[in-house]
UniProtKB/Swiss-Prot annotation:
Name the record gives this protein: Small ribosomal subunit protein uS9
Native organism: Aedes aegypti
GO biological process: maturation of SSU-rRNA from tricistronic rRNA transcript (SSU-rRNA, 5.8S rRNA, LSU-rRNA); translation
Family that this chain belongs to: Belongs to the universal ribosomal protein uS9 family.
Pfam families reported in the protein's UniProt record: Ribosomal_S9
GO cellular component term, pick one: cytosolic small ribosomal subunit
Length: 148
């Protein structure tokens, strides 16, 4: 019995982050599948931010995504933070896939298009919530002071 040799899976795994939301994207050769937690992109809520999710696809064109499957797991954060994490994960996954398995010139082209439009598509936003301190209701606000 001869075992059929499986060709190695050309895949990359990257993550996108926004606040406490983390999206892990797994990108491999395929036929253009894009799924978030097992659901297609157009079923992701809220519908108002649907265009934010579509931005990498609209910027780079569907033909760039035709040869790859991207599966994304997202957790943590709120709805908006998750959407920003997903779009970052999609962009980073495609760029790193092109770097590893296609060629450096097309990777640079993709990276330039994405950063020219919006830098947060590839670079995480470092802003975090400031911790609350004593003497006030929040991080900076103080309780009202009375003299008499």
């Amino acid at each position: 019995m001869v075992k059929a040799r499986k060709e190695p899976v050309n895949a990359v795994q990257v993550f996108g982050r926004k606040k406490t939301a983390t999206a892990v994207a797994y990108c491999k050769r395929g036929k253009g599948l894009l799924r978030v937690n097992g659901r297609p992109l157009d079923q992701i809520e809220p519908k108002v931010l649907q265009y934010k999710l579509q931005e990498p696809l609209l910027l780079l064109g569907k033909e760039k995504f035709a040869g790859v499957d991207i599966r994304i797991r997202v957790s943590g954060g709120g709805h908006v933070a998750q959407i920003y994490a997903i779009r970052q994960a999609i962009s980073k996954a495609l760029v790193s896939f092109y770097q590893k398995y296609v060629d450096e010139a097309s990777r640079k082209e993709l990276k330039d298009i994405l950063t020219q439009y919006d830098r947060t598509l590839l670079v995480a936003d470092p802003r975090r919530c400031e911790p609350k301190k004593f003497g006030g209701p929040g991080a900076r606000a103080r309780y009202q002071k009375s003299y008499r």
